A protein has these predicted regions:
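Active-site residues of response regulator receiver
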Residues: 53
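Acidic catalytic/metal-coordinating carboxylates
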Residues: 33-34, 60-66
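Two-component/phosphorelay signaling modules centered on CheY-like receiver
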Residues: 12-30
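C-terminal output helix
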Residues: 105-114
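Acidic, metal-coordinating helix/loop segments flanking the phosphotransfer/catalytic sites
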Residues: 31-49
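Receiver (REC) domain active-site loop signature in two-component systems and cognate sites
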Residues: 56
Length: 119
């Protein structure tokens, strides 16, 4: 059975590229551009990994990461945060994420991080 990945990014181009790249790598991928959709999708889709953009309209990826990591049922799901903010890694790690990928990023780096976290 394919590993499931949930992606949040409000940049449609990035969302599509990441979705297509991970689907090509044989992952079962769901994506959304709305932060309010994340927790219901986590409950419904039961992902093996979540990728969150740090800055999205409404609830940000850091706060969503905290919600996932504080929930008894979801706390062990690895979370990657995308960020365009260089030199904020300590702040981002404070949300409990398992990895940070700075934008712009290399798709090979993304796939390697994903594989490392869910293998």
């Amino acid at each position: 059975m394919s590993k499931r990945i949930l992606i949040l990014d409000d940049n449609q181009d990035i969302l599509e590229i990441v979705h297509e790249t991970l689907a090509y790598e044989k992952f079962d991928v769901k994506s959304t551009s709305n932060g309010e959709d994340v927790m219901p999708l986590v409950a419904e889709f039961n992902p093996n990994l979540v990728i969150l953009d740090y800055r999205v309209a409404g609830i940000n990826g850091g706060d969503l990461c905290k919600q996932i990591k504080c929930h008894p049922q979801y706390k062990d799901i690895p979370v990657i945060i995308f960020s365009a903010y260089i030199n904020h890694d300590d702040e981002l790690m404070g949300y409990g994420c398992d990895a940070i990928i700075n934008k712009p990023f290399d798709l090979t780096e993304l796939v390697d991080k994903v594989n490392g976290l869910i293998s």
